[in-house]
Amino acid sequence: MLAAGGLLTTLIYRRENYDDAWFGELAYFLATEGVIRSGLFADMLGWGDQVLMTHKLLVVLTALWIKIWGFSLYTVKTVALPFVALQVFLFYRYCRQSWMLCALLYLSCGVIVRYTFVSRPEIAMAALGFLSWQSLQQFRENGRIRWLLLAGMSAGATALFHLQGAVFMSAGAVWLLWARQFRGTAIYSAVAFGTFLLYFTDVVYYDAWDAYFFQIANDPATTALRSFSEKLFNLAEIPKIMLHSGGETPLTLVMLGCLFLRWKSKLPASDLEKYLLVLALCFAVLANRMVHEYLILFVPFMIAFSAETLDRMASERGSGEAVLFPKTVRWMNVLVILYLVAGVFYDGKLLYRNLQAEPLSKRNARLSQIVGDEPTTVIAPQSFIFGNIERHHIIGLGYYHHYNSYHTEPLTPEVFFEDAKRKGVRFVIFERNPITAEYKPPEDLPEVMADYRLIHRDERFRVYQQAPE
């Protein structure tokens, strides 16, 4: 309960994230207009009409959340919370002897604390991937097809959240082949792939295949795809994301300690260890890039493995049946305690940073007073959509961050303001130190640019207004 409470307190004044605005906007238009589109990036790859390449199930669930609670930063940020609860339930169901330790390690894990309240799909994908693994285990134990169907559907659903979910689809199939379950592999693969095909529902409905292939070929998120030989080097990148920061490193050290403990105790490799190995190999081959957020996909498995190992060592030590190494066990106990201390520190650090920052609602309210209530077109930071998307057409500064990728003419301040004039923009809001990838003009930008004049400046923002004709 304390770990859950600590996690929930980090939602207080939680700062906005780039993805909160991006997926929040897509979900807003789906909820209000019935189509996934973007105003922030309207002139990019046809996204102003329709976004066909995105984390679709995340957007759909966020749109449903908006229908229930209304559009706000906190609505967008809490979509993953039910999947955190699902993950804890799955620990209870799978790790009966050690589920409380699993839940404690999970809710105290820095990377989980950080991304539970960010509009990203990895938390949900990890929970569904773990459900798929549990179902595969059940199928292997009793042979009932219903578990195979559930495994395939949950693995396919991870790919509806993010195309990287193909990692779970592939890992399940490879693990079944390893277990010589050939018929099961065929059924599982068919169900998983059939579920994944739902991803193309909107593409088929609008007969938008040309637009889809154009977007997937030019999207900055997919152009990092590399050759097969280069992907093999992804294996060498996995340790980097496992030790990326204080959010990932403590869990990595606990898992490595448990691996060492199992090796010293000469315990045979468990099915979970085999699945983790398969998952890592599939990830190395299929992932288009290595970012630390993707470690979340492994977290439930790392925790289940660590908790099972610690619980087994404790029970066998009590029975006197195992060959134990007291010093190693003691060091593992110390490591787990340090892990929990690190989790408390991470919670506190995040909460402190949140409280130090000016709340987004106040910041946007201040900017809204400058812009006014009359509907108009504004170029602004992505997060300006919260509290303003209902009134204004907002073009994101993030669009201009990618401007040079899609235009032959280099983006200079003069080109920027000419483009703003061409789009009928009335206000331009620049942020001095944006926390996301957004266009930032020179600090010595003149007070008059084209038809725009500087009307407001403070320690964070500069606002330009188009002069009346």
Which residue stretches match the model-derived regions?
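Hydrophobic, aromatic-rich transmembrane alpha-helices
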Residues: L86-L90, L176, H244-A269, K274-C282, ...
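Extracytosolic helix-loop segments that constitute the early lumenal/periplasmic catalytic or substrate-binding loops
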Residues: G5-G6, F23-M53, L57-V60, A208
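Membrane-interface alpha helices of multi-pass inner-membrane proteins
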Residues: A103, R114, W147-H162, M169-V174, ...
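Membrane-interface transmembrane helices that cradle and orient dolichyl/undecaprenyl
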Residues: R93-S98, F130-L150, T158, F260-L267, ...
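Membrane-lumen/periplasm interface segments of specific transmembrane helices
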Residues: T185-R226, G247-T249
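Loop-to-helix entry region of an early transmembrane alpha helix in multi-pass inner-membrane enzymes
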Residues: K56-V60, L64, I68-L86, Y115
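Short periplasmic/luminal acceptor-recognition loop of GT-C membrane glycosyltransferases, typified by
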Residues: A357, S368-S405, F417, V425-A437, ...
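Short acidic/glycine- and proline-prone juxtamembrane loop motifs at membrane-interface regions
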Residues: N17, F117-A124, V291
